[in-house]
UniProtKB/Swiss-Prot annotation:
InterPro entries: Rhodanese-like_dom, Rhodanese-like_dom_sf, Rhodanese_C, TrhO, TRHO_N. PROSITE patterns: RHODANESE_3 (PS50206). Keywords: Oxidoreductase, tRNA processing. The keyword RNA-binding does not apply. Gene3D superfamilies: 3.30.70.100, Rhodanese-like domain. This is tRNA uridine(34) hydroxylase. NCBIfam families: PRK00142.1-3, PRK00142.1-5. It is an enzyme of class 1 (oxidoreductase). It comes from Streptococcus pneumoniae (strain Taiwan19F-14). One of its GO terms (molecular function) is oxidoreductase activity, acting on paired donors, with incorporation or reduction of molecular oxygen. Its EC number is 1.14.-.-. Catalyzes oxygen-dependent 5-hydroxyuridine (ho5U) modification at position 34 in tRNAs.
Amino acid sequence: MAKDIRVLLYYLYTPIENAEQFAADHLAFCKSIGLKGRILVADEGINGTVSGDYETTQKYMDYVHSLPGMEDLWFKIDEESEQAFKKMFVRYKKEIVHLGLEDNDFDNDINPLETTGAYLSPKEFKEALLDKDTVVLDTRNDYEYDLGHFRGAIRPDIRNFRELPQWVRDNKEKFMDKRVVVYCTGGVRCEKFSGWMVREGYKDVGQLHGGIATYGKDPEVQGELWDGKMYVFDERIAVDVNHVNPTIVGKDWFDGTPCERYVNCGNPFCNRRILTSEENEDKYLRGCSHECRVHPRNRYVSKNELTQAEVIERLAAIGESLDQAATV
């Protein structure tokens, strides 16, 4: 299948004057050329992923590079056969990635233009992965890690990036007096978080420059030492990274078998991202727990228009019922 769609991943920390108006103007331009995607704009900069055909994406890159302060913005480009987004969103936010330091009673937010970890090239990062005296920390959410991660990297038990500072403080014995290198999808989270670690007093902090997305495209390392796939926040869900010896590390939520298919839990008040096969999605009503399976607003049940009798039958098949907890 021809790959005539380009997906652009990018960010830039740079002061943006009147960022709310900038976001409105940016949205208008994106819509005028037929671009699709999701862009966040804040006083501190811009962070986005967009997709379109070659002509459209080229127009967009030229436009962004014409904006004051964004002449050298780095676009990471994937070639795909289908659009990665269905609509176009540009939103003004307080931060382009929500670390939430002020919300969580930390001192002040981090300005990566002033404080950030040392940049590591893909080759240097690979060397760090092989160094037994270096701690490698994945700064992404737990469900991103579970789909794929660097071999030996620490998995933080977090569901949101803003939980990471407190998690590190609670687990500081893993990091103190050690060299720490961090990584994320494209680099935007690491720019800020590595700066926070420097401010916290960690003496030797590095970050994978350009993120996993760049590591997978580097002609020298070719994504080696990455296991699984990389989670992305668009219609693709997962993309390849390791072009040397790819593996599957994702495990089905229900039976532990190898799996790289993500869905959201059927309970809208849970909405947990879970890996599961289509067969197990049907079997377990897309509920990550008994409570979620029997929730009155279970989206899987409503979407498939299951009758109560059909729900009871499926629950019985896995040893559960509507009015009692799971027996298996």
